Amino acid sequence: MKVILKKDVKKLGKKGDVVSVSDGYARNYLIPRGLAEEATRGNITQLKEKEKIKEKKHQQKIEEARDMASKLEKEKFVIKVKSGENGRLFGSVTTKDIAETVKKAGYKIDKRKIDLDDNIKALGTYRVPVKIFEDVVATLKIQVVEA
């Protein structure tokens, strides 16, 4: 019997897979526990429709991320901090500070997506990569100036 998996099942497949199993396994275990449904023409058509919608939403998110990345790369973000002699900062500029500055400019970025190797500890201009969505990366221009 062919079934469509509703959830991931160990040693059988992932959600959405169409697999062949014995009739007893399907009727007595998979279907009653809500792990699968019988693979009828209607159910398979419905599954394909859901996959198309999911792919369309995914493409839309990628497009939005690319649009946001291009907007972010055009802007220059200024962070004002106190500094001592020779342009050394009191403290440092962290991913949290960068995320807050970007948020003030009207963009929402998670601080964990900012790829800062080491905290910024001196005045100057820096290029900081940010992972927007999957493989969409924007490079922010951060200028650290004295307050």
UniProtKB/Swiss-Prot annotation:
BP term (GO), one: translation
Keywords, alphabetical: Ribonucleoprotein, Ribosomal protein, RNA-binding, rRNA-binding
Disulfide bonds: none
Tagged with keyword RNA-binding: yes
Cellular component aspect of the GO annotation: ribonucleoprotein complex; ribosome
Sample GO molecular function, one term: rRNA binding
One Pfam family named in its UniProt record: Ribosomal_L9_C
PANTHER family: 50S RIBOSOMAL PROTEIN L9
Function: Binds to the 23S rRNA.
Family: Belongs to the bacterial ribosomal protein bL9 family.
The protein's name in its UniProt record: Large ribosomal subunit protein bL9
